[in-house]
């Protein structure tokens, strides 16, 4: 029974994420999510009583997966030899991958919805704090000082986030990747060695 319930939740969350990408938050209905997942609307309500509950759970699901994947990348042998390249790969997955549009839809909705704002803010803060900790350790394990690691993480994040916003209307992954390769080359010259930033 428990495994069936978990499988049903997974299907409903997956359908929610797909429909957020296709129709946006405003166009999302619990009825359509239930149909996409192969359930009745009543069955959906057994797991999620409101649209807000469903979307919050879908957001948490996405970021839990991002933490798992980020942890795997940060622990890989590649991250020990080139942590920046590994970190860029993780950032691409989060900000330039298929989950970015659904999570952006969630963020915009949560910004002004009092029922969604607090829980969404909580798991977003947990995600960022967890990933900062994981990647700080990965960079420092590869020989970066704490100051270097902080600056490299934050500056790379801001670059990729800007690309992510641009990608909402102008998709150009090859260009973004070429730009990130150049950024990586600049960082590796040591020209930014004395730069400082607070990890956030």
Tell where the protein language model's regions lie, with residue ranges.
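Residues at secondary-structure transition points
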Residues: 2-3, 7, 49, 53, ...
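Helix-turn-helix
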Residues: 8-11, 15-53, 57
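Solvent-exposed, amphipathic alpha-helical segments
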Residues: 11, 15-22, 69-73, 102, ...
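An amphipathic alpha-helix signature
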Residues: 13, 56, 85, 128-132, ...
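Residues in soluble alpha-helical coiled-coils and helical-bundle/repeat scaffolds
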Residues: 49-53, 57, 75-78, 111, ...
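Hydrophobic alpha-helical connector segments
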Residues: 57-60, 68-98, 152-156, 198
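Amphipathic alpha-helical packing segments from all-alpha helical-bundle domains
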Residues: 67-68, 72, 93-104, 114-140, ...
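Hydrophobic/aromatic-rich alpha-helical bundle segments in the mid-to-C-terminal region
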Residues: 115-121, 138-200
């Amino acid at each position: 029974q428990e495994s069936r319930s978990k499988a049903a939740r997974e299907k409903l969350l997956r359908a929610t994420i797909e429909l957020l990408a296709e129709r946006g938050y405003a166009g999302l209905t619990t009825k359509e999510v239930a149909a996409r997942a192969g359930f009745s609307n009543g069955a959906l309500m057994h797991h999620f009583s409101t649209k807000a509950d469903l979307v919050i759970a879908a957001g948490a699901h996405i970021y839990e997966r991002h933490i798992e994947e980020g942890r795997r990348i940060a622990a890989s042998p590649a991250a020990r030899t080139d942590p920046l390249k590994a970190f860029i790969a993780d950032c691409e997955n989060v900000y330039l991958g298929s989950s970015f549009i659904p999570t952006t839809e969630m963020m915009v909705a949560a910004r002004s919805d009092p029922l969604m704002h607090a829980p969404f803010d909580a798991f977003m803060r947990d995600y960022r704090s967890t990933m900062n900790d994981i990647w700080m350790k990965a960079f420092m394990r590869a020989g970066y000082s704490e100051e270097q690691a902080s600056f490299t993480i934050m500056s790379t994040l801001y670059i990729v986030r800007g690309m992510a916003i641009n990608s909402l209307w102008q998709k150009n992954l090859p260009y973004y990747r070429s730009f990130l390769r150049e950024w990586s080359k600049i960082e590796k010259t040591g020209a930014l060695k004395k730069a400082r930033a607070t990890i956030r």
